[in-house]
C-alpha cells in the first residue's frame, strides 16, 4: 500500500469537535519524525467545518479540496457536533466524510484492534480474554446501505411516514475489499474471517459466494472462515484473540469495530486507515483518522485522548510512507508511555492522574526520545 515517490504530500485536516485538538498532537509527532528521522514529506494544514462555511459557504473550502486532491495521505480529525445545525443540510452533505470516501473511492477501511497490557484494567473485558489480542477489521467503506439508492422518508397513502434504505453490493465491490483482506492476512497470521448475514440477506449471500470464489481462485493458501454478524459480535467479546483479519461490509464493520474497541480499553485508542485503488503510478490515496467521533461534550476542554490519532500516524508511516521501522518506533513509544502510567481521562483508573491532550502528546514525544535512544545504542 506504500507509494514510490520520494516526497510524500500529507494534508492535515483537524475538522470539528475534538478533531483539531487530537490532530495537533499528531502533527507534533510528524514534525518529530521529520526533524529526527528525515521523514520525506510535506505537510499542509487545511480547514473543515463551520468556520470555513461561515467564510466561504462551504464546509470543504476550495483550498482544502486542493490540499486533499494533491495529497498522497490525509490526516483527518473528526466531523460533527452541535455546530452542524448551523450548516444547511445540502452544504453539510456536499462536504461530508461519506462524500470524501466516495470521491476518492476509499473502499478499504483498516481498523487494528490491539489490546495493550498496560490498559488491561481500562477494559471491561477480563485480562485473560485480552491476552494476545491483535487483529484487523477491514470494512468495505464506499458501498452498502450507507450509499445505496433509493433512500428517503415518504408519506404513505394512510398518512404514516416510512423510512427506507437500500443495501446493495456488486461482485467487484466485494472482491476488491476481500482481496485487501487476503493480501493483508498473508503478511500476518494467514487467516481471514468473513462476516455477513447470509442466512437472511441476499447481499450477504452474494458476499459469501464472491469471497469464497476469490479465495478458491487466488488465495487458497489463506485460511478462510465465515461468521454471521451476530455471532461475530459475540465472539469478539468472548475470545477476540481467535481473529487475525476480519472482513465485512460497511454497516457491519462500523458496528463491529466499535464493539471491538473495548478490547483496547477505549474508542479513543483506535486508529484507522482507508485506501483507494492503486493508480497508474502505483500509489493509493489514503485517509488516516482515529475511529472516535467529534465528542462535542468534551470539545475545547483539552482532555481528549490523542492516541487514536497518533497511532493513525503510525499506520501512515507503515502503509504510505513505507517506513515500517519508524511505525514500530512510534507504536513502541505509545506503549512505553502507557506502561509509565500516562493516562487521559477515558483510560484512567480511579485515583489515577489524568493527563490533558497536550500532556499525553508530551508523554509520547518523551517516550519517542527514550525509545529512539535505546535503538541507537543497539544499532
What does each of the following model-derived ranges do?
Residues 16-19, 72, 138, 181, ...:
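Buried hydrophobic positions in well-ordered alpha/beta secondary-structure cores of metabolic enzymes
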Residues 36-62, 234-236:
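N-terminal beta-loop-helix "entrance" segment that forms/cooperates
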Residues 54-164, 251-253:
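N-terminal glycine-rich phosphate/adenylate-binding segment common to multiple enzyme folds
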Residues 31, 35-38, 70-73, 102-109, ...:
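Generic secondary-structure signature for well-ordered alpha-helical cores
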Residues 142-143, 148-188, 192, 198-200, ...:
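Glycine-rich phosphate/pyrophosphate-binding loop and the adjoining helix
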Residues 52, 237-342:
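Glycine-rich phosphate/nucleotide-binding loop
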Residues 199, 207-271, 368, 372:
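Accessory "access/gating" subregions that flank catalytic or transport cores
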Residues 11-28, 32-34, 157-230, 239-242:
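Glycine-rich phosphate/diphosphate-binding loop of Rossmann-like nucleotide-binding domains
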Amino acid at each position: 500500500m506504500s507509494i514510490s515517490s520520494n516526497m510524500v504530500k500529507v494534508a492535515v485536516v483537524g475538522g470539528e469537535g475534538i478533531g483539531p485538538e487530537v490532530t495537533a498532537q499528531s502533527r507534533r509527532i510528524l514534525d518529530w519524525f521529520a526533524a529526527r528521522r528525515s521523514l520525506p514529506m510535506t505537510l499542509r494544514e487545511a480547514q473543515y467545518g463551520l468556520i470555513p462555511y461561515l467564510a466561504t459557504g462551504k464546509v470543504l473550502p476550495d483550498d482544502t479540496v486542493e490540499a486533499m486532491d494533491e495529497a498522497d495521505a490525509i490526516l483527518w480529525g473528526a466531523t460533527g457536533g452541535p455546530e452542524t445545525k448551523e450548516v444547511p443540510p445540502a452544504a453539510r452533505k456536499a462536504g461530508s466524510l461519506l462524500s470524501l470516501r466516495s470521491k476518492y473511492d476509499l473502499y478499504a477501511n483498516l481498523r487494528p484492534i490491539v489490546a495493550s497490557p498496560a490498559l488491561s484494567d481500562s477494559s471491561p473485558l477480563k485480562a485473560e480474554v485480552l491476552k494476545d489480542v491483535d487483529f484487523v477489521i477491514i470494512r468495505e467503506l464506499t458501498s452498502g446501505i450507507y450509499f445505496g439508492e433509493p433512500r428517503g422518508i415518504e408519506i404513505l397513502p394512510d398518512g404514516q411516514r416510512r423510512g427506507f434504505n437500500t443495501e446493495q453490493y456488486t461482485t467487484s465491490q466485494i472482491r476488491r475489499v476481500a482481496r485487501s483482506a487476503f493480501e493483508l492476512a498473508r503478511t500476518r497470521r494467514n487467516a481471514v474471517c468473513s462476516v455477513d448475514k447470509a442466512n437472511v440477506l441476499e447481499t450477504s449471500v452474494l458476499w459469501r459466494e464472491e469471497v469464497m470464489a476469490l479465495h478458491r481462485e487466488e488465495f487458497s493458501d489463506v485460511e478462510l472462515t465465515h461468521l454471521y454478524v451476530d455471532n461475530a459480535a459475540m465472539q469478539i467479546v468472548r475470545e477476540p484473540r481467535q481473529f487475525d483479519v476480519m472482513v465485512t461490509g460497511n454497516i457491519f464493520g462500523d458496528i463491529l469495530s466499535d464493539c471491538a474497541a473495548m478490547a483496547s480499553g477505549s474508542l479513543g485508542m483506535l486508529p484507522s486507515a482507508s485506501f483507494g485503488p492503486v493508480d497508474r503510478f502505483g500509489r493509493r490515496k489514503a485517509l488516516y483518522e482515529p475511529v472516535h467521533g467529534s465528542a462535542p461534550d468534551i470539545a475545547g476542554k483539552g482532555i481528549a485522548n490523542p492516541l487514536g490519532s497518533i497511532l493513525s500516524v503510525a499506520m501512515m508511516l507503515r502503509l504510505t510512507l513505507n517506513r515500517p521501522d519508524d511505525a514500530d518506533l512510534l507504536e513502541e513509544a505509545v506503549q512505553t508511555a502507557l506502561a509509565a502510567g500516562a493516562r487521559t481521562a477515558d483510560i484512567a483508573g480511579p485515583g489515577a492522574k489524568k493527563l490533558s491532550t497536550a500532556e499525553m502528546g508530551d508523554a509520547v514525544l518523551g517516550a519517542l526520545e527514550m525509545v529512539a535512544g535505546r535503538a541507537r545504542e543497539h544499532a
